[in-house]
Structures are given as structure tokens and as C-alpha cells.
Amino acid sequence: MVAIFNFQSLLVVILLFICTCTYIRGSYPSLLEVRDKHSFSGLPRKAAIIGERLSPWVSACCLIMGLWTLYN
């Protein structure tokens, strides 16, 4: 099933996107720097900021979703 139509899959995709963007920004900060922060190209930068500022919550959500996927 497509991840857009399944809420659990959509959450997994969003969490993986946030974690990936945060990792990329930590390793290669110049990759996510864009001039127009309000366009679609600024979305990975915003996801990286969310991942940095809410890292305990994002990691807890990743852990919960991983266990949910494993046992479901």
C-alpha cells in the first residue's frame, strides 16, 4: 500500500525523513543550506532543525514506531 494512504507508513516515512535530514546536516551542513527558506527546497532544512531541537522526542517516536512495526 502507498505510504500516503496508510497512516502508520506515513509516520514511518516522516520520521525517517527527519532522521536522515538531521544526519546529513550534522555530517555535511553545506548540503542543506538554501537561500529561500520558505520554498519546497527548504523542507529538508526544516526537517533537520526539527530533528535537532526535538531529538529526544524524535528518537522516542522512532523507537516506538520500530517496536510497533516489529510486533504488528
Curated annotation (Swiss-Prot):
It comes from the Eukaryota. The chain crosses the membrane at residues 48-68. Involved in the early part of the secretory pathway. The gene is tmem167. It is found in: Golgi apparatus membrane. It comes from Dictyostelium discoideum. PANTHER family: PROTEIN KISH-A. One of its GO terms (cellular component) is Golgi membrane. Residues 69-72 are cytoplasmic. It holds the Pfam family DUF1242. Keywords: Golgi apparatus, Membrane, Signal, Transmembrane, Transmembrane helix. Belongs to the KISH family. GO terms for biological process: intracellular transport; protein secretion. Residues 1-26 form the signal peptide. InterPro entries: KISH_domain, Ksh1. Residues 27-47 are extracellular. This is Protein kish. It is a single-pass type I membrane protein.
